[in-house]
């Protein structure tokens, strides 16, 4: 337990026979339950986990193996673990990938904001950790930074970065609100989940943690397939959030600003294409065409910035700043001392 809260860790696995044993063997002492979810791995992942379960005896946390009959994606694997943790009424459920890229020594820093009631969901942020630029492969850093910017707009959590991290912790109350069957099942799962959390006005903490690479993990990313899917997913989830949060549940004029930004943006593209076509055909840039294009482009930018500002202000109260990783403390210590946790007084 962590400060009187039960803690489970979901470990999604796909072809991690060389890595998953290390993850299970280094699980922190305060973890009560480990839910390993095998996503139909064709390698020996299941056998490795079963050997660990047989050999652990009474040492360490309880380990439960859950299996998918077919490969459904990392998001589906995590949601399978979430559903089991929710069924068991576990207070806090964290996620640690089976490839060993998530430092178990930092799990307490991730769990603490949720255990202490400061956040409903906490996620790692590797991009802002000192030295991250030199540790994270350059193409991953830049790609993650771009997707993080797009996720800010789609989700409404403007303070978060490193949107693609899977190192997270969530409260039981948050899990009770979520429709786990509807969550995106594959690589875009963390982005989709943030959008759904925002719909319920749940607080999200961004915890700066050390990035871990080159520990034997094998990347399963396929950029040519992921980029088109992620672009469509973020656009679709953004539009869904606008409809659900600012039209159906409560009206806010920011949807009109976003709509105006989209309309004038499309108009500016049309005028620009016409301008270029006429310049190629005649060698002359029509003055009126250029003026209208400039006006629509400027209007689109202004409408979009106003809409973002409105959205940022509407969601500012969901921002949970975590300045430094707080240490874990034995259950009951806070009650015995009668003191507030460091950094939370007032």
Positions of the model-derived regions?
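N-proximal low-complexity "stem/linker" segments adjacent to membrane-targeting elements
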Residues: 1-26
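Acceptor/aglycone-binding surface of glycosyltransferases and processive sugar-polymer synthases
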Residues: 66-87, 92-95, 104-187, 213-228
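Acidic helix N-cap motif at the loop->helix transition within catalytic regions
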Residues: 18-22, 43-53
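Short helix-capping segments at alpha-helix termini
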Residues: 54-61, 89
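Short hydrophobic beta-strand elements that form part
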Residues: 8-12, 35, 67
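Cell-envelope/extracellular polymer assembly enzymes that use nucleotide-activated donors
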Residues: 6-8, 33, 192
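A conserved acidic beta->alpha catalytic loop
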Residues: 38-47, 70, 100
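Hydrophobic helical membrane-anchoring modules
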Residues: 1-2, 183-346
